[in-house]
Amino acid sequence: MSDYMRELRARVGSRLLMMPSVTGLVFDDQDRLLLVRHSNGNVWVAPGGAIDPDEAPQDAVVREVWEETALRVEPIHLRGVFGGPEFRVRYENGDEVGYVMAVFECRRVGGELRADGEETLEARYFAASELPGLALAEWARVILPPLMKRSERAWIPPVTWR
């Protein structure tokens, strides 16, 4: 947890915080998607996390992918911006976060794939056909299947506001 988040949590306790965040979609040469298994919740997600104060989203996704997988990446497309009830997470300590997530497709430019052993326990590539059998985070179940269809265009889910 960043110093910024610690300070916020000291002020608001476990109440809901809306958090700008990023996720990186990294594909291998067989169009398999890189996922990491998080230690918190033991679920699979694409690498990503919170945007730090004064950090640009494109820098945050590069940093987060590096921290979680040891891969150097370059963002090449913004695939969408997502939020809603599926993006609300209650952590084991009771903290609640509602993520608003900018999702970038990224190109691998260096590094050797490995999980960090703390935040991420495992990192590997999965084919689209393997996703239904995985223990995915709720938000990942919503957005990853359509985003596996690679495109230079953003994907916008159906509008639900009435």
Residue ranges and their predicted role:
Residues 19, 39-41, 46, 73, ...:
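Short connector loops at helix/strand junctions that flank enzyme active sites
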Residues 37, 48, 117, 135, ...:
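Short, flexible helix/strand-to-coil boundary loops that buttress conserved ligand/catalytic motifs
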Residues 142-162:
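Charged phosphate-binding loop/patch that engages nucleotide di/tri-phosphates or the phosphate backbone
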Residues 23, 32, 122:
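Conserved beta-strand and immediately adjacent loop positions that scaffold enzyme active sites
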Residues 8, 46, 113:
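Short clusters of hydrophobic/aromatic residues that line enzyme substrate/ligand-binding pockets
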Residues 28-68:
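Conserved Nudix-box catalytic region and its N-terminal flanking loop in Nudix hydrolases
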Residues 51-77, 82-139, 162:
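Unchanged
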Residues 1-23, 94:
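Acidic, metal-coordinating catalytic segment for phosphate/diphosphate chemistry
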